[in-house]
Amino acid sequence: EKFSRDHLRISDRRYGRFDELAEGPLPYDLILSGSDQIWNPKIFPDGRFDPVFFGTFSQKRRIAYAPSFGVPTIPEGMQAELKGYLDGFSHLSARETQGSAIIRDIAGKDAPVVLDPTLLLTADQWDSMADHPANYPKGGYILCYCINRPGALTPYLEWLHQETGLPVVQLCGIRQKVHPKAKQIMDA
């Protein structure tokens, strides 16, 4: 919180829809997209990318730091859409070599491979920012981190829960629980 307060201009307002972002005057110098698998085509079930992850809601300068595609290739039907989005960035980077190659092949732009931002801090720095609420499970627990719908994980997690007796903690931004008794942590 101290770092955010001292170094970042974060809006007090929560935006729930693309049009809310597009309508509001955003008091920022630039729009930064990244990291994780924000450009993974598999997380978009309708076969189209989500324009919010490309910052298209604003005419401000756009930069991408360490985005990941999570796949070796982009489906042919999504390549033109991706090129249009990538063309709007003044600076691009990628979290892995294959992402850099995708950007080069589709948009003709160089994108250096950069370190995942989670690895830019030491363990002590992370611990100083970590939330240690009293309601986290004591002792061991099964941690599940999902990028998209839990689907096939649900029966496996149920089996693990039954075998170990450990509670399930779901660490992700999706709203669908992987296990009926999972504790969800939405702001990981």
Protein language model features and the residues they cover:
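Aromatic- and Gly/Pro-rich donor/ligand-binding loops
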Residues: E1-G84
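A short beta-strand/loop micro-motif in the catalytic core of glycosyltransferases
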Residues: F89-E96
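Catalytic donor nucleotide-activated moiety binding site of glycosyltransferases and closely related
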Residues: R61-G70, I102-I103, L153-A188
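Conserved catalytic-core segment of nucleotide-activated headgroup transferases in glycan assembly
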Residues: M129-L171
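Helix-loop-beta element that forms the nucleotide-linked donor phosphate-binding surface
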Residues: S100-T118
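Alpha-helix capping/helix-boundary segments
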Residues: I38, Q98-G99
